[in-house]
Curated annotation (Swiss-Prot):
CDD domains: Hfq. Keywords: RNA-binding, Stress response. InterPro entries: Hfq (IPR005001), LSM_dom_sf (IPR010920), Sm (IPR047575). GO terms for biological process: regulation of DNA-templated transcription; regulation of RNA stability; regulation of translation, ncRNA-mediated. Belongs to the Hfq family. This is RNA-binding protein Hfq.
Length: 85
């Protein structure tokens, strides 16, 4: 795992696993809302009434709608489930 990914992956994975609603602000100011369905190195799949593939380089900020625990889910990454935690 690259050093820059060490916080990003557990953060996004916890949002995905707990189905936390998020607001994603793009660098051009547009606000997207939904739940993180999946993600990889370059994109986040955001689900609301439709699924949108959002490129990470276009994202400014990810704002969770409610508190959640990142540290409880640090065993997995990239939107994949893990039974061994």
């Amino acid at each position: 795992m690259a050093k820059g990914q060490s916080l990003q992956d557990p953060f996004l994975n916890a949002l995905r696993r707990e189905r936390v609603p998020v607001s994603i602000y793009l660098v051009n100011g547009i606000k997207l809302q939904g739940q993180v369905e999946s993600f990889d190195q370059f994109v986040i799949l955001l689900k609301n009434t439709v699924s949108q593939m959002v490129y990470k380089h276009a994202i400014s900020t990810v704002v969770p709608a409610r508190p959640f625990n990142v540290s409880a889910h640090q065993g997995t990454a990239h939107g994949e489930e893990s039974d061994a935690e």
